[in-house]
Design a protein with these regions (language model features):
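Conserved acetyl-CoA-binding loop of GNAT-fold acetyltransferases
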Residues: 127-136
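Short, high-confidence coil segments that cap the C-terminus of an alpha-helix
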Residues: 108-110
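Short amphipathic alpha-helix that is part of the acyltransferase structural core
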Residues: 1-40
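Conserved acetyl-CoA binding element of GNAT-fold acetyltransferases
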Residues: 73-86
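Conserved acetyl-CoA-binding loop-helix of GNAT-fold acetyltransferases
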Residues: 90-103
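A conserved beta-strand-loop-helix scaffold within acyl/acetyltransferase catalytic domains
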Residues: 57-73
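Conserved beta-hairpin
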Residues: 32-62
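Conserved beta-strand-loop-alpha-helix junction that forms the acyl-donor binding cleft
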Residues: 114-124, 139-143
């Protein structure tokens, strides 16, 4: 809904979810049914897909969009909590991640995306998709995540 001349965050989140549904339908032919939940007062909203699989295809995405504390009407960064796709090793995950990045670039004002890879194979996937080890983010007070081993992608 419009508030004055400003588009509110729920409209942005609805658009992000709609675009993610289109990406997954086009790529995997799954109605992923992306949705969001959370409260602005918590500092972030979580986006996730309710439908995870169809036949031998599967996608699971869970990410948060965090607000900028200096401007509470804008998102500062996205934190991908979980991303998994099947089939693997044929480029579908990379295709989907790159399209997600494009959606976030066009619909939000986020500065960067972060991920905390669970193991070396996962880390290599993200590095292949242009995420980098960035130690300066470890001391960035704007990030509400207490982890040291994060990869980032700057928008």
């Amino acid at each position: 809904m419009l508030q004055g001349n400003v588009i509110c965050e729920e409209d942005i989140l609805t658009s992000v979810c709609s675009n993610l549904n289109e990406i997954v339908m086009k790529t995997l032919h799954i109605n992923a049914n992306f949705d969001f939940y959370g409260l602005k007062s918590e500092g972030y909203y979580t986006i996730h897909n309710k439908n995870k699989s169809f036949e031998d295809k599967r996608i699971d995405l869970n990410m948060r969009l965090y607000f900028n504390e200096e401007n509470e009407n804008e998102f500062l960064y996205a934190y991908i909590l979980w991303f998994s796709v099947n089939p693997k090793k044929i480029g579908i995950g990379s295709l989907i991640i790159n399209e997600i990045i494009e959606v976030l670039k066009h619909l939000t004002n986020i500065e960067f995306i972060i991920i905390h890879p669970k193991d070396k194979e996962v880390k290599n996937f993200w590095i292949k998709n242009k995420f980098i080890e960035d130690h300066k983010l470890n001391s960035d007070k704007r990030i509400n995540i207490n982890t040291r081993r994060i990869l980032s992608y700057y928008i």
